Regions:
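Surface-exposed loop/turn motifs in large extracellular/passenger domains
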Residues: 1-17, 24-52, 58-85, 91-120, ...
């Protein structure tokens, strides 16, 4: 099995005050299938806008929770995200893998923010956590490469009391 999510451009806006917004979400492969490959490459997640007053909506650029043999998330850009979220539920996660990938995880050459727009801008005081690249759940025998990623443009216009973890 090969699942390929390549060369997409995604623009999203959400004006409600709860829930979550995810640009690309891969899920459902369980139990682990060591011969499966998931490829998420060369995508642009652009301008996810969560604008409900006092929103607690989470923003995620790319998310994988499937248990494949190989996971490649390479050369993607997540940029121009904005939020009015003031609570911890309004977290920003650029790229996350929570799938129990068996053999290889490659999360390389991605940009969270670039010269055109930063990764995330909060327009209110917030305690929403910021996670750049978050990877967990793989077995100790899995080879992991998280290299040459660029994280920039994390803006808190009115201040922040949040944790920030970039990789």
């Amino acid at each position: 099995i090969n699942a390929t999510y390549n060369n997409n451009t995604i623009n999203l806006a959400k004006s409600s005050t709860s829930g979550a917004v995810t640009g690309i979400s891969i899920e459902g492969m369980s139990p682990a299938l060591s011969t499966a490959a998931i490829k998420v490459n060369n995508n642009l997640i652009n301008s996810i806008d969560v604008s409900g007053a006092g929103s607690s909506s989470a923003i995620t650029g790319i998310s994988n929770s499937s248990a494949s043999g190989v996971l490649n998330i390479n050369n993607n850009t997540v940029r121009g995200c904005t939020s009015t979220g003031s609570t911890a539920g309004a977290r920003f996660t650029g790229i996350t893998n929570t799938g129990a990938v068996v053999n290889n995880i490659n999360i390389n050459d991605n940009k969270l923010g670039d010269a055109i727009a930063g990764a995330i801008s909060y327009s209110v005081f917030t305690n929403a956590p910021v996670y750049g690249i978050y990877n967990t759940q793989h077995p100790v025998t899995c080879s992991v490469s998280i290299s040459n990623n660029d994280i920039s443009g994390i803006v808190h216009s009115m201040g922040s009391a949040s944790i920030q973890v970039y990789i």
